[in-house]
């Protein structure tokens, strides 16, 4: 138990610093060398797709079996027997809850859903993407709007146009990111086995670092002062450690109520991973017209790495 607690505390510290570094580096890099940021687009995209594979394995090879196992223990305490797929239902409830949260943010937003003019972006959308929609959970790095280049057929996105991102939009992005970051942290904090903590940490660290990079790019393009950017970055970076802390508190609770809360929250967190994989990462990355087969390869590679770790009980 002591080793497990130490592992979770190390995860808290690790994810916090990965996210903090990921969100603040773009603020300096884009200000000093936009071309360097442009060249890193492909690397970020492949890392994001690799993260999608990691989350697939996390959801179906680690979280779902854990929820099933804990659910069986909870039901046996109440002498309840059922063949209904309760674990899968709880996981999908988490998925629907995350979809609802995203659509709620879009519905009540007075401003446009993207950090840039959708008309400007969509006028040149045939350059690199088939999409005309930008999720509020995704910054420019994941939607790749920051890197559309002029090809001489219609308006294209200029570097100067990117600086119009308002602080209100940045704050709404930070809120949206924080909302499901807490659930990702909960999933880590609720784990009872060391190998599952490690596999979850890899998935969360890869994904959340890329999320932080997206936030950092948005802050850089909005010309946010470094001090304010640091405050926002610290706030968002603290959400996963907060979730891990909440998970630790719930996991330490004794009796049936603590077990029920643990299995429900773990299942809902699994639904959040499902949302991130299919609607955030894959929906955006695989619609890009470049490197599609390479992205599929990285997706399978990400899944294989985590599935192998679960199989070997590493």
From Swiss-Prot:
Extracellular side: 1-3, 64-85, 191-196, 251-262, 314
GO cellular component annotations of the record: apical plasma membrane; hippocampal mossy fiber to CA3 synapse; plasma membrane
Ion transport listed as a keyword: yes
A GO molecular function held by the record: zinc ion transmembrane transporter activity
Pfam families to which the protein is assigned, alphabetical: Zip
Cytoplasmic side: 25-42, 107-169, 218-229, 284-292
Keyword field: Cell membrane, Ion transport, Membrane, Phosphoprotein, Transmembrane, Transmembrane helix, Transport, Zinc, Zinc transport
Subcellular location: Cell membrane; Apical cell membrane
Reactions that this protein is recorded to catalyse: Zn(2+)(in) = Zn(2+)(out)
GO biological process, one term: limb development
Protein's membrane topology: Multi-pass membrane protein
TM ranges: 4-24, 43-63, 86-106, 170-190, 197-217, 230-250, 263-283, 293-313
Coiled-coil regions listed in the entry: none
Stored InterPro entries: ZIP
Modified residues annotated as Phosphoserine in this record: 125, 129
Main subcellular location: membrane
Similarity annotation: Belongs to the ZIP transporter (TC 2.A.5) family.
Function: Transporter for the divalent cation Zn(2+). Mediates the influx of Zn(2+) into cells from extracellular space. Controls Zn(2+) accumulation into dentate gyrus granule cells in the hippocampus. Mediates Zn(2+) reuptake from the secreted milk within the alveolar lumen.
The protein's name: Zinc transporter ZIP3
Gene name linked to the record: SLC39A3
